[in-house]
Amino acid sequence: MVRDTRNVDLERGLELCKPEKVNKQNLFTNIIKPQKDKINIKTDKIKFFLNNLFTEFSKFHDSCYPDGRISTRSKLRWPLLIIWCILIVFAIDKNFEVKDFLSIWINESFINENRFYSEIWGPIAIYICLFVLLLLGLIYCSKIVVKAIPLISIVIAAVVVIIAVAMVKILYICHWLLQNFNFGFRHKS
């Protein structure tokens, strides 16, 4: 007589799901711990990025303004602000791997000819817009802070970090908009 084995796997699965059969240690080791480790790695990466940013900002501030004062009338203000914006954009690319994220769009747009040009020009336009916004934000801050104590450099660095994080967030939102609404020019076939 042939035994019906259709429900054997289902019965075995239900048996393993019983509370007394679940091994909580294995659940933690196989599911929760890897996720926790990933979060810790990302947190360490962000801490390292912020530490580097604060260190570089302190060096920059001390070399340009040894007495701890920031002058809005300095002729070097514009070039320094532009250089800082470029450095922050590259720092975000280096630490958060935005470049690799953007390369996916570009590769896909060349593989599939029906995709929109926005996937190539979109990221470039986003970077330019973010660069201008960051520059305007820093100029606005420099107009408010005419003479500052050395401690104000920490506040300015914190504002720059918040803007940098916002830039990454805006990048992801713009990616979603480009994918869902297909802004841009159609590829002529």
Curated annotation (Swiss-Prot):
Record membrane topology: Multi-pass membrane protein
Statement: the UniProt record of this protein carries the keyword Transmembrane helix: yes
Transmembrane portions of the chain: 78-98, 120-140, 148-168
CC per GO annotation: membrane
Domain of life: Eukaryota
Entry keywords, A to Z: Membrane, Transmembrane, Transmembrane helix
InterPro entries: DUF999
Disulfide bonding pattern of the chain: none
Family: Belongs to the UPF0494 family.
Name of protein: UPF0494 membrane protein C977.06
